Amino acid sequence: MHLVENFALTAGVKISKPHIEPLFYPPPADKYITLHAGSGMESKNYSHYKDVISIIKPILDERGISILQIGETHDPHVDGTISLLGKTKLRETFFILSKSMLHLSNDSFSSHVAGFYNVPLVTLFGPTFPNTCHPFWRGEHKFLSPDYSKFKPSYSPNEEEKRIDKIFPNEIAYELIKMLFGDGIINQTESVHLGESYSQVVTDIVPNFTPEKNIN
């Protein structure tokens, strides 16, 4: 049961579609998708958006589509996006979302607002079940989550090893491009493992000489 249905059942009221009043804000691009990398819970925040953007940006650039990042001032800026972090009021953010071609985000308020406007959604889940917390009003969508067969969602605001980070960046990129343009634009690849050192840069230095035996 979805949380909205649960609340309605508990309160004994009917579910009706809310009214959201946006406020005009001039978008810095004519055609764009939106990214919201933050949320109210650290465990919901996906750590590998940079890799997703590196895959999809060349494809979007060819078609004149920008990536606008919305969120708070303290949210980390994702390379390859136009930052609107801390630059829009809440209702102005609603306007930006309402005109977006697609919205990519964690399980956060922005996905629910974008879904209200029937904006196509690619939404990531980690510490919560998608079927209970997904945007209640939505159009075309793809909800991605880790494998819950062994370990169920924690519903904790902090996780020592974030479950959401088990979602492969190439899977997100594939679903996003497929939703925008259909099949055939990007190849679907099968990933095997995404470890805790995935985001670390490791440099191996291999000398091109044999050191002397008495070297200290």
Predicted regions and their residues:
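Catalytic machinery of carbohydrate-active enzymes
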Residues: 1-216
